[in-house]
Swiss-Prot record:
This is Type I restriction enzyme EcoKI endonuclease subunit. CDD domains: DEXHc_RE_I_III_res, SF2_C_EcoAI-like. The lineage of its organism: Bacteria, Pseudomonadati, Pseudomonadota, Gammaproteobacteria, Enterobacterales. The gene is hsdR. Residues 143-229 form a coiled coil. It comes from Escherichia coli (strain K12). It comes from the Bacteria. Belongs to the HsdR family.
Amino acid sequence: MMNKSNFEFLKGVNDFTYAIACAAENNYPDDPNTTLIKMRMFGEATAKHLGLLLNIPPCENQHDLLRELGKIAFVDDNILSVFHKLRRIGNQAVHEYHNDLNDAQMCLRLGFRLAVWYYRLVTKDYDFPVPVFVLPERGENLYHQEVLTLKQQLEQQVREKAQTQAEVEAQQQKLVALNGYIAILEGKQQETEAQTQARLAALEAQLAEKNAELAKQTEQERKAYHKEITDQAIKRTLNLSEEESRFLIDAQLRKAGWQADSKTLRFSKGARPEPGVNKAIAEWPTGKDETGNQGFADYVLFVGLKPIAVVEAKRNNIDVPARLNESYRYSKCFDNGFLRETLLEHYSPDEVHEAVPEYETSWQDTSGKQRFKIPFCYSTNGREYRATMKTKSGIWYRDVRDTRNMSKALPEWHRPEELLEMLGSEPQKQNQWFADNPGMSELGLRYYQEDAVRAVEKAIVKGQQEILLAMATGTGKTRTAIAMMFRLIQSQRFKRILFLVDRRSLGEQALGAFEDTRINGDTFNSIFDIKGLTDKFPEDSTKIHVATVQSLVKRTLQSDEPMPVARYDCIVVDEAHRGYILDKEQTEGELQFRSQLDYVSAYRRILDHFDAVKIALTATPALHTVQIFGEPVYRYTYRTAVIDGFLIDQDPPIQIITRNAQEGVYLSKGEQVERISPQGEVINDTLEDDQDFEVADFNRGLVIPAFNRAVCNELTNYLDPTGSQKTLVFCVTNAHADMVVEELRAAFKKKYPQLEHDAIIKITGDADKDARKVQTMITRFNKERLPNIVVTVDLLTTGVDIPSICNIVFLRKVRSRILYEQMKGRATRLCPEVNKTSFKIFDCVDIYSTLESVDTMRPVVVRPKVELQTLVNEITDSETYKITEADGRSFAEHSHEQLVAKLQRIIGLATFNRDRSETIDKQVRRLDELCQDAAGVNFNGFASRLREKGPHWSAEVFNKLPGFIARLEKLKTDINNLNDAPIFLDIDDEVVSVKSLYGDYDTPQDFLEAFDSLVQRSPNAQPALQAVINRPRDLTRKGLVELQEWFDRQHFEESSLRKAWKETRNEDIAARLIGHIRRAAVGDALKPFEERVDHALTRIKGENDWSSEQLSWLDRLAQALKEKVVLDDDVFKTGNFHRRGGKAMLQRTFDDNLDTLLGKFSDYIWDELA
């Protein structure tokens, strides 16, 4: 029998948490609800005091405080799990009158473990033996005497007279605390408001007292205290028992809708399946295995009477997926006969037969020798899912019905209804639907969009879980996604699809496309009841849900409301190159001493949460995107789209060069300059060194208004802000964009006196604080006459479709090929309404000289910003010396190396800047003194000395330097503020050169000669090139695309050839690439391709007495040739040809002579008489 509190050891250490724990015990088992409420209070009080000890700033609520604790590397996952369990179940008790006795017992046990951990931490009694936990048996008021004692102390305090003001305040604090304790101990029901206030006041009083104690210590003493707390906390875990680990797993299962209690819901204690009840029954006996031994499944999950899953759950599961083998054994050895006999003792034969038929369903394993009896197998150790150590955490499961199904890690359990739905699905049958329904005519797709959808379907049928689709910007990725989702839902292969975007504007654009798209007369929205950005959770009937990453982070990662892992079974990721970043794998040392939140992107955590097939859409698949999703299952390139006539080509870039951009700007040491602070203030400065600025530095480190003015004046010769062709200008910063807007308005106002103010505006993320208003501005740019010229930084770099953009101006240096391609993609769309036949790029910052080539892209990795204090903590922690990294050095040595490098950079910057700023100089002098005292060198030699002496010596030095890191952080801030202020230079500038860029060639004549030379010396380089030169009728569309891409790689684009010919011969001839090849190879005259087609058509019409129907089709064929250049079977599968019956119908129209007719067209087009 329990004769004293399990939490007795807290008495005198933290009387407040002790009193709360006593009250929780006092109400067990008579009032589980109050026990749960008190244990929630216990968790809050413990966390709040822990936050105080660890210098965590005050948080608004317990959830935020725990998130901050989670960022501290030493706080073990299990500790956070216990805090969260106490909080969540306590919230249920407060708000829903949750009154579960088992939960109350679990919270007492877990709170006890937490109390032991806390006690060891704050008392430094690290070897404190864990007392035996005794569960309170009945509601004896064990604390009656304690309440009486407290009341006597209260009366005595009231009678005592305080003399000084300090004594008065101390007495008041004591009275508040005593009243709080009494209110807590006497509370048998939910607290009244007065009791709540007393509790909070008591807590605040005690924390204030603790804070006052800390404040009396010196800074060095406080630092030493915090260090010791941290050091020891790293070593301490909760050391949960098997039973307590099961408590956590039980809670996870209950969160997912299962009845779970490892103590009472056990087979040995009579727990049996029940109709209409979803149970996780522990220690269920299985049949004998191959060795003849009978086993016991840790859990069998029953939906009603039906066993649906088996679970291997062990505290010491290190590699969780490896223990799935145990779960497989449970499934293979599961004895359905025994289950039927057990159920027949309680239920009718009909009920039993329906749930467990005598003819049992089973599934063959990979060996072919054994069969699985239970379809879903799980393994877990109760540890929260961590992407950076996936195999040692989370809930691993596998659907064993198909040998091709792989095991997966999940952060939550499947819900019962989700498993039933999965069990009822028939993937093979649903996959067959795609083969049985290949037609997509009702979807109105282009041929390549159909090919893309088929490629995705083929990958799904093969069992691929991550799928990448690469389609050039402007080729209808959203339309393709709509068609793909339509068919995926129609096939019933997927029940609910998440369309995930990383910005609200992209989501609204997608929703608009869904509303505009009609299938068989109905809008896509109306067919599937699509839920949008404002819908928090989709209803069961919802088939498609559009959401931003940010909203799902709040709903999934920062909410107590559970997000089922099977809420979506397919996720379509739009613009996948943007937010979806490859996560950095942590080293052993980083795993132990640094927070995983630094390493895992929110995007990745969201996608990892759901048990779903992920389909990513992008125009520019970077290396990191491919590493995540695999190679694209289908590609449709920009060049192919141009050849197909679905996108327009670009003219050769127009380079605008000013005198300062060409010569650079050189400033000498000692020169007086003005800097502009972020607040717009002018700061006088003297240069300490020579500085040489190139055009890439313009409007970053150097602001020359005359440069922007000269460029804007030159643009007036090419752009018309009163017309319908629109322009997008990319700037460096928001401040730069503001300057450019004013310069453009001033320049164009001179040429167009009637220019309206809104013809030229800025649209950036901070153009308006309301995101909806920014979206409205983008919509105006797209659909209204004004604005005509928009200046931006990076808001419109990707995903926004505005077909009327005909000009792209780069006033910002871009080195990333992916970003450049995305920016350029804003202008590639067709827009005949504004007479758009090509688009122009204006390069004002020499962008092509430094643009990265595609094959030099490197993975984009989340590289956490490691703070100086973190590195210092790591070298002063003895445990970091015991962790060996891959190169054989300790984690402390790695941290020391990073620390020295960071210090060296700060020292270098400080030395350079100290004469420029009196504030910095003063700080460096103080640092000189501190370093001299602690390390025997001045600040300038500090990093070198640390490197020389090593991490142990460095750790001792930093222990002598309290507040040193704070000083360094202040110094860094002041240096950055000084250096970030760009130099303002009021000098003249003028445009000295405007020319079209032809790759490596200075003149269009050189460009054409190089093209001719390439053709003449490489006739065998491409099979299609041979066909063009020797037998054009053999050229296929596939060959034409490959040929076009081959010339593109040599930087001989068709549009550049046309422009170069025009500049050298003063003739604008649309001869197409084939015309230029034949001119260079066989000397054909350069004539417009359309003229050649018309000549061939006239000749063919004169050869026969064609019917009116045949003449109409001849005209259509000629028009198709003008657009496509080459006609082959694929052309007849799309558009008007397809709608009118395809190639078969044309064969009948031309008496089975269609191929001969097409051959004549090809011959006559290139006839020497043409």
